[in-house]
Amino acid sequence: MSDQQTCVIDNGSGVVKAGFAGEDAPRAVFPSIVGRPKNVSALIGVDSASEYLGDEAQQKRGVLKIFYPIEHGIVKDWDDMEKIWNHTFYVELRVQPDEHPILLTEAPLNPKTNREKMTQIMFETFNVPALYVVIQAVLSLYSAGSTTGIVCDAGDGVTHTVPIYEGFSIPHAVSRIQLAGRDLTTFMAKLLTERGYNFTSSAELEIVRDIKEKLCFVALEYESALKQSHDSSQFEKNYELPDGKVITIGSERFRCPEYLFKPLEMNGRELDSIQDLTYKSIQECDVDVRRDLYQNIIISGGTTMNEGIGERLLKEIENRAPKSINVKVIASADRIFAVWRGGSTRTSLSTFASMWITKEDYDENGASIVHRKCI
């Protein structure tokens, strides 16, 4: 299979990242959405279709009902998921899937039936020659050049902390909360409403997401930042809306991501904070590996892209960790693509050749082969 270029596909709840093994960045990055017209007359015209995928669905979302086949990291709608994969191969990457080995990523604690369904669709619908399925966090760690550490991965639909030892995740110590990018966008809209700006439709929430991504930051000392924002306008920034109107954003810039660190205080949700999630995962591991985990905390995913998040997480974990341990948080500049890049690197290695589930393996054993080959 060495002459066939591997396709690496990282399916996130919010965004698909797809490309070819050995390359530094994905060729295609597009929303993991399927859009269908709210009513048939809304899209009369030459280009009207019964459904739209990815960027096209995003552009037309004002007149579409938007569906996310992946919710909180787990595939919920297989028909739509198949459409997303079809779009990935034929439109975005422009490849014939039966000519390329495929690496797919999965969320930690992905149900066994889901792993089998992914495997079945790849071999039976797309007729791929070979497949490998790997946990996203393992690839994040891999792209950071390590095989032991703990990954705090916050995407669009779910946040996970995954301890990994010598390249294998430690399933009983994996933690997750359904608090991630989409929740922060909704929370930001709520904060902006308090300021007198109303954003409610799905198209308007896209504007809020852009505000969140461009202007938010994590305060190292939240209370003192809050006091400063009351006493001065130093945190205020202007944002121009698509219609040309300019709005001013102030303390919302750091109050929004504070939700990750104080879910109960900020928005009344009784969830673990990301620092508690990370700490609990480490404490669930064998005492002998904890030091290695504390010294190699990797943050990845789009929701970790706000400035200051690494420093704040470090401070919070240092407050909880044994004083004798030198805690280290690693936040690479392009961590939004860490999972994809880890997959690109890993499948490029000659040692990976024996890892694949081949078509022969599948024909002989069925979809359950994924549990034996992809541990």
Curated annotation (Swiss-Prot):
Its localization reads: Cytoplasm, Cytoskeleton
Q: Chief subcellular site? A: cytoplasm
Q: One MF term from GO for this chain? A: hydrolase activity
What is the top-level taxon of the source organism? Eukaryota
**Which Pfam families does this one have?**
Actin (PF00022)
Q: What is its EC number?
A: 3.6.4.-
Alphabetically list the UniProt keywords: ATP-binding, Cytoplasm, Cytoskeleton, Hydrolase, Nucleotide-binding
* Any Gene Ontology CC annotation: cytoskeleton
Catalytic activity from the UniProt record? ATP + H2O = ADP + phosphate + H(+)
Please give the SUPFAM superfamilies that the UniProt record associates with this protein: Actin-like ATPase domain
Which PANTHER family did the record assign? ACTIN
The UniProt family comment states: Belongs to the actin family.
This chain's function reads: Actins are highly conserved proteins that are involved in various types of cell motility and are ubiquitously expressed in all eukaryotic cells.
- This protein is called what? Actin, cytoplasmic
Species name: Oxytricha trifallax (Sterkiella histriomuscorum)
Which lineage? Eukaryota, Sar, Alveolata, Ciliophora, Intramacronucleata
